[in-house]
């Protein structure tokens, strides 16, 4: 029902989720003999960056916030990013925003709940069961981002990985942009 409301333009439907990316190469769809250990020599210690993001159901636009840790502060920073894009703006009609999130610990902490409550006038949250990726549309996009844009690469540091994450999200958004001539209409 929410998807139909979003497609009709009554609401903005966002699917949210968090994931992590590593500075060392992630091997996606690599071939090896059965039982072989797939390891790629990489310099230094592997570092992680948390990717917190939302996917707009209608426009298929991916919004990503990279954070050094997967904590409530990163989720709140992502909410602030959503404020700028979807929050109420003076002089413009506001559409209600529905955010679909799982019940992960960073989404349900006291800080996160307080941040969500402060946005309750324009943002409502629908909670999925814990660790249930199937109903969340962002899971496939996140998998695509990691497997096709971030895999098989070694990043010098977390700054380079952060830049690569945002470039990959921009590339995905360009791929998913609707083509203006895709739905031709006959003018009357």
What are these regions (language model features)?
Residues 110-114:
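Distinct, well-ordered alpha-helical segments
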Residues 16-17, 79, 91-108, 131, ...:
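Acidic/histidine-rich, metal-coordinating catalytic segments
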Residues 10-11, 138-188:
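C-terminal anion-handling pockets and recognition modules
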Residues 37-44, 117-138:
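RNase H-like polynucleotidyl transferase catalytic core
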Residues 14, 81-92, 166:
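Structured catalytic cores of enzymes that bind and process phosphorylated ligands/cofactors
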Residues 1-81:
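Extended, low-complexity cationic-aromatic segments
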Residues 12, 96-97, 124:
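The start of beta-strands in P-loop NTPase/AAA+ ATPase cores
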